[in-house]
């Protein structure tokens, strides 16, 4: 099944392409945990405990370096009934886990932003949440291919970069707190596939695009 979606080279770094009894048991436990959280969603949400960050699951560490794998796995899960039966993961569970992950990040933002700023961040966070896996995979590829400067003639990349910038399109007085939050809480980057290298490159790229949009100075 996996060989229809991944090359032989990619399968070598995909941790669950081959059968492994211990890993399968770990997966069943993770799915069971998610099912319990779903059953107690309101109570868990109010306590800020909803999260899906299998950082302790060592077999996932290799996927964390391949953001594009997640997009393909999502497509595979939607298209392959066999995979859904094998994993026990339903579309409702995927939505729940995704939002739980987002809530864990918003709980951190709440310590740094005021109520208005947090509401703005929450609105756009969920607006763009499902776009993130494909977007960050595109950004990784663009960063690898154009390290010295951002690609200027690729419309799809421009669109992706502007969508990403909408997540942080806030007033200047908020940006310092957002930067402080990222600096003081590395956990914000955990599980996002966004590395410091790609983030730095993206900030420079968006800066170039904004200057180009403003036109030459007289």
UniProtKB/Swiss-Prot annotation:
It comes from the Bacteria. Keywords: Antibiotic resistance, Periplasm. GO terms for cellular component: periplasmic space. It is found in: Periplasm. GO terms for biological process: response to antibiotic. Albicidin resistance protein binds to form a complex without antibiotic activity but without catalyzing any further chemical modifications to albicidin. This is Albicidin resistance protein. The lineage of its organism: Bacteria, Pseudomonadati, Pseudomonadota, Gammaproteobacteria, Enterobacterales.
């Amino acid at each position: 099944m996996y060989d229809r979606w991944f090359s032989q080279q990619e399968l070598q770094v995909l941790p669950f392409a081959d059968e492994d009894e211990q890993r399968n048991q770990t997966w069943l436990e993770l799915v069971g945990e998610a099912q319990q959280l779903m059953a107690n969603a309101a109570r868990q949400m109010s306590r800020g405990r909803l999260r899906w960050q299998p950082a302790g699951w060592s077999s996932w560490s290799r996927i964390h370096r391949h953001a594009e794998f997640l997009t393909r796995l999502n497509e595979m899960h939607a298209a392959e009934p066999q995979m859904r039966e094998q994993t026990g993961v339903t579309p409702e569970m995927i939505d729940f886990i995704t939002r739980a992950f987002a809530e864990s990040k918003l709980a951190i933002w709440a310590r740094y932003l005021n109520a208005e700023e947090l509401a703005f961040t929450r609105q756009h966070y969920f607006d763009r949440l499902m776009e993130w896996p494909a977007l960050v995979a595109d950004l990784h590829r663009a960063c690898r291919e154009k390290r010295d400067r951002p690609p200027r003639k690729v419309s799809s990349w421009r669109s992706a970069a502007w969508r990403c910038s909408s997540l942080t399109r806030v007033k200047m007085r908020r940006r310092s707190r957002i930067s402080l939050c990222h600096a003081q809480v590395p956990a914000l980057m955990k599980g996002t596939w966004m590395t410091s290298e790609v983030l730095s490159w993206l900030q420079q790229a968006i800066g170039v695009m904004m200057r180009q949009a403003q036109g030459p100075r007289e």
